[in-house]
Structure formats: C-alpha cells, structure tokens
Amino acid sequence: MTPSPDSFTTWITGLRKWHGWLQLSAERPYMHSEEAYNSHYGVAAVETREGEGFCNLLQTHQIDTTGPALEIGCGTGYLTCGLARHYPGPDYLITDPSPTFLRLTQDQFGSNFAGIARRHYAVFNADDVTLLPTGMFSVIGLRSTLHHILKVEDFIAACARALRPGGARVMGSEPCETGFLLMAAVAQSIPSTLKAAGIEMRPEWTYKLNDFTSSVQFYCNRDIDKTYGEDKHYFEPYAMARLGETHGLKLEFLPTGSFQDFAPPYGNAFHCFSSFFLMYLQFCMRFDDDFMAQIRLHLKAQLKFIDDCYRSHAGPAVSSIFLFKKTPGATS
C-alpha cells in the first residue's frame, strides 16, 4: 500500500531535532577532513549536471517520482544541488552522518534557488536504514556511497522495503571489482617498467604504490572484518543483480556510466581506461607530480593496449551506475 501524501510530513515532523538538523542516527564524522574533501578530488565549483542527469535517468527508466526522494551520504553535495533543482516530487530528504558535510551541502543553496521539492536535512547513517518507513520513498539516491556501507546485503534489503513499487534505488560512481583489480595489476608493473627504463623507485613512491595495491586487495577480500575501514567494498554486477532480484529489484547496470552523462551536452565522463587510471592515482591516491610524470611516460604501451581493447565500446567497468527498480507487486 502506497503511503498517503501526508505520511512523509507526519513522519518527518516527528523526528528529533539536533543542533538544527533532523536526527535519525548518531553523528559520525568522516575519517578525513570534510572541509578539504573537494580540493582533494579536484572539485572547484558547485556541480549541477550530476543531479540533472540523475533525474533524466529516472525519466528514461520510467521511475515513479510522485513521492519523496532520499539521498543517503550527500557528502559535499556533488549530486545534491542538481537533484534538488530537477527532482519533480514533493520532498527531498538530504542525509549524511557528518553534520559538517550537511552544512557544506546546505551552504550551496541560496535564497533564490529554483527547485520544486521541499528540502530537508538529517543526520543519518546508512547502517540505520531499517529505521525508514515501509514504502515511503519513490527514489533512494546514492553517489559514491555504497562502498562505505558495511552490510551491503542488509542495506539493499532495507532499501527495497522503504521503496514504493515503481520506485528505484540509484547508485552512481560505485567501484567495480574487475576494473579496479585491473588497475592494481597494471600498477604492480610500475616498478619493473621504471627499472627497465633506468628509473629508480623512490621510497615515497613505493609507499604510495603499496598503499594503492593493498587497498584494492582489502576491498576485494570478503573474508576479513571491514568494520573500521572507511571504504570497504568493490562490486560485481552479476552478484548485485542476483541480490536485487531476491528483494524485488530489477537491476539496470550502466558500465563506466556517470550521472552527468545524461545531462546536456550528453557526453561521456569516462573517456578511457588510461584517463581514469591516471586520474585516480593523481587525485585519489595522491601520487606526486614526478611519479605521475614517469608513469605517463613509461606505461604508455600497457595503457594503450587496454584502451585499444575498448576502442568501440564502454569498458572496462571501473566506476559505474547501478539502477535498481522495484517491480510492481514486490513486497520486500
């Protein structure tokens, strides 16, 4: 049974208030500096195309948008601003376990911001998703968030329960296992490639390289405790499809897709493997400029080989979109 239009208002009005925020969970700061997050990833301006593309994707896949939308893990609002401007439903609940991230996101909205949906902000940890009312939301959106969640299967089951039939849980910028494993395999060839070129690995280069490859191994492993890791998982589309099907969710997998691909001018944010690989090492892993210059120069052949394998189709799947639509009649 679909909740009445007033049920969201009744529920959200009854939530506890804490330091100006609605509160569903205890606060939890991000493991690194929230204030420095955008500069760390090279984000210099407010992004609107991600949210616009997200909403266009909903329309393309005929997702019900008559009910509220929920964003889990807004971070600095990379998805939020455009989604708030273009979401056609009545309400938009913006959440993060970090009050600092909520403030950074809220600060993007001026008094003259154009958007239909009413915006609400709540301190909320994704691990508490079972607290959400059954059948409340038309859309649950996440960008670069699922891999932070410890119990993925429980999370997907709880999201399915909180969705209306015809609604969707849409996740973007989520890491795919095979693509990142390929990146780590290429990275492991860096020392021998540089040695063959007469370049000696510096101790700080070895440290950063080992940090990357050991992180990939940590995320791939499924037999260790990941409770205290900030990032925890990589994903495999076939396993995700089976998991979604168990809970009445049909998966549409968009390999290498980014939400902004579905907004004007409708380009592809993912250009090729080599571009993503080099960007990731530079901005995410913080390889220094000298190290990056040597990698660009001496790994050209390896990177070109992979790019040529995907010269006419998208791939390999590294960072992708997972859209789960709740099928009519599903009761999970």
Question: What are these language model-derived features?
Answer:
Residues 78-128:
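Class I SAM-dependent methyltransferase SAM/SAH-binding core
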